[in-house]
């Protein structure tokens, strides 16, 4: 894994390479994956160890305006539940983003969706909302070499892994139709199909 990642970044500046090297040293010997991986059917595999990737930010209770394309039936159902989103990016893509301000091929972003809770088991909380039960995991993947591209000419694909507190997410998932996630991201995400406007870690480094 180390040689494959370093081959992508031989031309990066030393400061950017330091970011990547620090991640690799911190995670050496643990079960990690970076970049997209697919099964024999062309479905994407849920990355291992993604919670140790670069955390780009979180948000609570985002609800799109009903008249815009983002409000699909799935988003409408999600809007009924106050939800936390926590987002991670694979370290190799983040190192490249620091250098160029753009998302390289490939890039993987993972978003966990949690139910917002206002009451803790011990009853200690007076006010506030915290992440409770996990509802699902979603992936945004920029990979022009991805399999199962029939009917799609887009570099970005989106995947949904159902899985709550009672069960682990599915091991693999197929790409959503372009008319669902991709169309919304293309219309409203601020930078290369990513909602960079919601995450200052990325927003401050993007380039036109």
Describe these PLM feature segments.
Residues 1, 15-16, 71, 82, ...:
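Detector for methionine-enriched segments
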Residues 1-11:
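N-terminal secretory signal peptides that target proteins for export/translocation
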Residues 11-26:
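Bacterial N-terminal signal peptides
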Residues 32-100:
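N-terminal secretory signal peptides
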Residues 35-39, 46-54, 58, 100, ...:
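Sequence context surrounding c-type heme c attachment/ligation sites in exported
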């Amino acid at each position: 894994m180390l040689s494959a990642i370093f081959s992508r970044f031989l031309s990066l500046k030393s400061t950017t390479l330091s970011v990547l090297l620090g991640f690799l040293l911190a995670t050496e010997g643990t079960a990690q994956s970076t970049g997209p991986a697919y099964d024999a059917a062309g479905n994407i595999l849920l990355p291992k160890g993604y919670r140790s990737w670069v955390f780009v930010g979180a948000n609570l209770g985002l609800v799109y305006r009903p008249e815009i394309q983002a409000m699909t039936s799935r988003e409408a159902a999600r809007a009924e539940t106050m939800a936390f989103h926590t987002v991670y990016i694979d370290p190799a893509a983040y190192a490249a983003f620091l250098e160029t301000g753009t998302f390289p091929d490939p890039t993987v972003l993972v978003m966990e969706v949690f139910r917002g809770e206002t009451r803790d088991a011990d009853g200690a909380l007076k006010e506030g909302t915290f992440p409770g039960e996990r509802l699902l995991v979603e992936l945004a993947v920029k990979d022009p070499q991805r399999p199962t591209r029939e009917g799609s000419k887009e570099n970005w694909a989106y995947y949904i892994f159902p899985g709550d507190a009672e069960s682990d997410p599915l091991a693999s998932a197929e790409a959503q139709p372009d008319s669902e996630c991709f169309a919304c991201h293309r219309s409203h995400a601020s930078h290369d199909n990513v909602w960079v406007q919601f995450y200052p870690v990325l927003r401050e480094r993007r380039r036109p």
